A protein has these predicted regions:
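N-terminal hydrophobic targeting signals that begin at the initiator methionine
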Residues: 1-2, 25
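Bacterial N-terminal signal peptides that target proteins for export
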Residues: 2-13
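A generic structural signal for short, non-catalytic loop/turn and secondary-structure boundary residues
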Residues: 14, 61, 88, 243-245, ...
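N-terminal processing/targeting junctions
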Residues: 14, 76, 148-149, 277-279
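C-terminal motif of bacterial Sec signal peptides marking the signal peptidase cleavage site
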Residues: 20-23
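Low-complexity, disordered linker/stalk regions enriched in Pro/Thr/Ser/Gly
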Residues: 25-167
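Acidic, low-complexity intrinsically disordered segments
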Residues: 165-312
């Protein structure tokens, strides 16, 4: 069909209109990409941790549990439902208690896939919450550090020192009360007496999950013998080590020496374990059948505390 000059003009106008639409479509998808983990981004901040809840620096708490809550110190990295990327769940953290090893790095995403119980991530607030139990009456130093997925780490991470003094009187406990170890490694705990007076004998009954850990060995270390032999006596002990059922029993007495017996704080025996089960937590328990007696054969134990092993 023969095209008129009017048809040609219409085609030119239509082509121009389509070109405008195409150009606008290109502009709509050509948006700016924001990456707060990239140091080149205008809103980038170095890794920094803001602690919202933990014991007061230098203070003494009267509880065997402590809660620590933290997040990034820059609100641009906090949880925001309008953000295309949830930066809060992608930041990695690790913590350390006293001289123990650093925990593995865990992001919020990683914690949501695990079942650690004691360390959780709240998707609605973007907060990390850590609860530590079985803390004994000693001084503590806690630290937490962050890093980005790009492996840029925090240089000046927060730390705090505090003291636990939860109970008065004679205590029999697993020490340290919190043990952190890598999967498949060997670790140890001590059975410990605190603030005992005129001690002469103990029946210790310890149980553990032998599908999680195996007792490799036990020993009276030098710190134990120094404590137990301070009255210049000698030690008599009987041991029942039932690894098949996860139970260790020790009957120990201090014979001879000073009439006043042993007083103070010290370790009784060291228990050396190997982790053999799944990752997670497991308790090393001291039975209520355990007893501590003084030179007059009186039972003097007032508090018994178990311990917990956390395997990363």
């Amino acid at each position: 069909m023969r095209k008129t000059a009017g048809d040609l003009i219409k085609n030119i106008i239509l082509s121009g209109f389509l070109l405008v639409i195409y150009s606008c479509g290109q502009l709509e998808v050509d948006i700016e990409v924001v990456n707060l983990f990239d140091p080149a981004d205008a809103n980038y901040s170095i890794p920094g941790t803001e602690v919202l809840d933990w014991p007061t620096e230098g203070h003494t708490i009267d509880s065997t549990s402590a809660v620590f809550t933290w997040r990034h110190s820059d609100q641009n990295y906090h949880y925001d439902a309008t953000h295309e990327v949830d930066y809060a769940e992608r930041i990695f953290y690790r913590y350390r208690l006293n001289a123990s090893i650093w925990s593995p790095w865990n992001s919020g995403e990683a914690l949501l896939q695990q079942d650690l119980h004691f360390w959780t991530f709240d998707t609605l607030t973007g907060l990390h919450v850590l609860k530590l139990d079985y803390m004994e009456d000693i001084d503590y130093n806690f630290a937490v550090m962050s890093k980005y997925p790009t492996n840029i780490q925090e240089d000046d991470w927060p730390t705090i020192s505090f003291t636990v003094d939860a109970f008065d009187g004679v205590e029999l406990l697993i020490s340290p009360g919190q043990v952190f170890a890598d999967s498949g490694t060997v670790f140890y705990v001590n059975a410990k007496l605190i603030d005992v007076t005129d001690f002469m004998g103990i029946h210790l009954d310890v149980s553990y999950d032998n599908s999680f850990m195996q007792l490799l060995d036990y020993a009276l270390e030098s710190d134990s013998t120094d404590f137990l032999l301070q009255s210049a006596g000698h030690l008599i002990n009987f041991i029942d080590n039932d690894t098949q059922n996860g139970r260790f029993q020790l009957d120990l007495g201090v014979a001879g020496g000073a009439v006043t017996g042993v007083s103070g704080t010290g370790n009784i025996v060291r228990l050396i374990f190997e982790h053999t089960g799944p990752r997670g937590q497991s308790v090393i328990s001291i039975s209520s059948e355990s007893t501590v007696r003084d030179v007059y054969n009186n039972s003097v134990i007032e508090h018994i505390f178990s311990g917990v092993v956390s395997i990363w």
